[in-house]
A protein has these predicted regions:
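Charged, low-complexity intrinsically disordered segments
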Residues: 2-160
Length: 160
């Protein structure tokens, strides 16, 4: 009889794919208050308070400073790393007047037009940085160098 596969080890393998974030139970716990903040923007009165003074509105939420800083910077990639769920974060960019397409294009390092064209043509090319560890082992760029290179392919992870 074979042993049960380790689901945590399996999910951890996805961390090696640039730009891929599996929304796990751990990530959900990490981002609980962040996502609750985002959902609060469903109410008009909360959106008005948010627009009037973002920092003051965030002060009412028990989020980490890193989460608050990322919200204020509208760094959606960082917010995903900090437990944000893109469907909850949609409330933030909708409040800013951005469409899903506009917001997601900011995560790719591409203009909205270039991102839309890429997606309409079938999505990101399979060429480029496909594995963080393989790229490092091959002596490829790491850190911000790989991040910039990956952005052109739709990747923006800090740990490329």
């Amino acid at each position: 009889m074979s042993a049960q596969p380790d689901i945590h080890a399996y999910i951890a393998e996805f961390d090696d794919i640039p730009g891929t974030r599996v929304y796990t139970a751990a990530r959900a716990r990490q981002g609980y208050h962040l996502n609750q903040f985002a959902m609060s923007l469903m109410k008009a009165e909360n959106r008005e308070r948010w627009k009037a003074d973002e920092a003051a509105y965030l002060a009412d939420w028990p989020m980490t400073e890193a989460q608050k800083d990322a919200v204020l910077a509208r760094d959606y990639n960082r917010l995903l790393d900090l437990g944000g769920n893109i469907y909850f974060l949609a409330k933030v960019f909708s409040t800013d007047g951005l469409s899903f397409l506009q917001a997601v294009s900011t995560m790719s390092g591409m203009s909205t037009e270039d991102y839309a064209a890429m997606m309409n043509a079938g999505g990101r090319s399979p060429d480029g940085v496909r594995s963080i560890s393989a790229n490092r082992a091959a002596g490829g760029a790491t850190g911000s160098e790989a991040n910039r290179a990956a952005a052109g392919a739709g990747n923006t992870r800090e740990d490329c």
